[in-house]
Amino acid sequence: MKRIVILTCPLSETVCTGGSCLKAFNERIRAFSRYKRENMELVAFMKCSGCGHFPGQDKGLDEKIQYVLDAKPDVVHVGICASKGKEKRKFCPEIEAITTIWEKAGIPIVRGTHSEF
């Protein structure tokens, strides 16, 4: 069973229902097509705590990060909404800080859900 977390940006909430990420997950398309032959479980669908909220400075964010660590996911998929810049290839500083913690814990990070970047 592939245990998966999806991380997205709260700034996208005005235009995003999460439906495209969930559709890609449920239909095993786009970034989730790599799991075509595996059982999958979505163990968390989370947003960071917003711009300016970094690990170690925001208790709620720290709790969310720890929840993911405790859930022991096999992989974290980061939505394109968490990218920045004209080319949409880099994480914002907050997402970069969060994913670095998980990577150091041995959790692979995949750039993409319904869109890959």
For each predicted feature, which ranges?
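Proline-aspartate-enriched helix->loop->beta-strand connector
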Residues: K72-P73
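Conserved mixed alpha/beta catalytic, RNA-binding, or beta-rich assembly cores of soluble enzyme
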Residues: M1-Q66, K88-F91
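Short Gly/Thr/Asp-enriched flexible loops that form oxyanion-binding sites at enzyme active sites
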Residues: E87-W102
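Divalent-metal-activated hydrolytic enzyme cores
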Residues: G106-F117
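Flanking helices and flexible, charged tails adjoining ferredoxin-like Fe-S electron-transfer domains
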Residues: E41, I101-W102, P108
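Flexible loop residues that form catalytic
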Residues: C81
